[in-house]
């Protein structure tokens, strides 16, 4: 689906992970554009998404803490500031601890104060809303007591997704959108991912009985998302048959 085909004030929750501007090798997108142009692009899509959500609509935005390659940039701070500037209201930030410090390959100046790199193995999930935080309607929640207690802790500990296994340069695990969806939306709510990628958000929508909408400009990634959704549906049917 094209984003212009989505009706305004119709989305309950947006969960997405946009291009990071850190030189990830996407097929149809240059992820190494000048940083000021990247921020202009960010402002444009954030404003468009603001018009799509309901007055009590929410946004869960997965972004990096910073950018070291090609010059240090405070990506999290800059994008959060832009989101507020275009009209989003800030609620909180969740720290996603990917626990992948062992995959580090660069330290800058090794064992020297000359120019060391400090790299945190975390990403950020910025939680924002349009006009009011409290939901206008009372829906059905499907979050358990244990999930609620764990997920309202602002540090989430789980691993990332294997890009080779999934076939996408920057997939996020289904666990990430699933947590956001169950914590910040009701059953049957409409969830949008404007950067669908490999389809993790729509798989999470299937798991949680939400109505999912995905937007993706790359045909190959669209086909990958459809393939994963079909495989998930087949797996679910097999589980039902076994049970």
Please annotate each region the language model reported.
Residues 1-4, 226-243:
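S-adenosyl-L-methionine
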Residues 1-224:
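Core catalytic lobe of class I
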